[in-house]
Amino acid sequence: MSTFTNPLKSRLKETDPLFGLWLSLGSDAAAEALAHAGYDWLLIDMEHSPNDSGDVTSQLRAIAAAHLPSEPVVRVPSSEAWLVKRVLDAGARTLMFPNIESADEAARAVRLTQYPSAGALDGERGVAGAVRAAGYGMRRDYVQTANAQIATIVQIESARGLQEVEKIAATPGVDCLFVGPADLAASLGHLGDSKHADVQAAMARIVSAADKAGIAAGIFAMDVASAKQHRDAGFRFIALAADVMWMLRATRQALQEVRS
């Protein structure tokens, strides 16, 4: 089988913006269909969506079945070693960790994605050969190549994380800082108001920290206008809302138009 590679990890180092979509429906059919939409990446959400490790595996298969460039990302609900291991064994190559608040937490997230090896003796990932990620044992170089190909994205979504953001960004193995705008706004005392000046200043600080560390900054955008604003502000890894949001917007608009 071909060598295990992660094109998204290398693309995160480039300057061109990468636009993605949140998959919240828990549907492998939706995941496969949306792989045809042309997004750079599709995020399978385990934190706020009804996805367990089996659902994630089904959606990873569905996206792969499209044979198109959309790269799957999986957001795990927490830094639990057993869960991270299952998601990686299922074939995920890029993981997002929520609410990282210190360099130590960021370093732990990275360790969870790494096999113990000469370059990462503190890696915490358990070794299993006959898993989907390794072609069920047919991709024999997987264990040797996986460490260098797994991408780690950490979310900054609290006042505490913001205060440590420069140290988090400088953590070896972190590929991207991703802003959780709703939670960040709430943590800064502005629940429901991510447009507040304090929140905007926090976002600018996160972009600056990422730039200084030579990594990407990402964010969730509610609509096209917001996505363009974030792009112009220096964000390079941008989620253009979620599948369920676009489904409701389009169907409601169509119904309103036909009834008018």
Curated annotation (Swiss-Prot):
Aldolase which can catalyze in vitro the aldolisation reaction between hydroxypyruvate (HPA) or pyruvate (PA) and D-glyceraldehyde (D-GA). The condensation of hydroxypyruvate and D-glyceraldehyde produces 2-dehydro-D-gluconate. The condensation of pyruvate and D-glyceraldehyde produces 2-dehydro-3-deoxy-L-galactonate as the major product and 2-dehydro-3-deoxy-D-gluconate. Also catalyzes the retro-aldol type decarboxylation of oxaloacetate, a general property of known pyruvate aldolases. Its EC number is 4.1.2.-. The record marks D89 as: Increases basicity of active site His. It comes from the Bacteria. InterPro entries: Aldolase/citrate-lyase_domain, HpcH-HpaI_aldolase, Pyrv/PenolPyrv_kinase-like_dom, Pyrv_kinase-like_dom_sf. The record marks R75 as: Transition state stabilizer. The active site is at H48. Its cofactor is Mn(2+); Mg(2+); Co(2+). GO terms for cellular component: cytoplasm. This is Hydroxypyruvate/pyruvate aldolase Bphyt_0320. Shows a slight preference for Mn(2+). GO terms for molecular function: 2-dehydro-3-deoxy-D-gluconate aldolase activity; 2-dehydro-3-deoxyglucarate aldolase activity; metal ion binding. It catalyses: D-glyceraldehyde + 3-hydroxypyruvate = 2-dehydro-D-gluconate; D-glyceraldehyde + pyruvate = 2-dehydro-3-deoxy-L-galactonate; 2-dehydro-3-deoxy-D-gluconate = D-glyceraldehyde + pyruvate. Pfam families: HpcH_HpaI. Keywords: Cobalt, Lyase, Magnesium, Manganese, Metal-binding, Pyruvate. A divalent metal cation binds at E157, D183. Belongs to the HpcH/HpaI aldolase family.
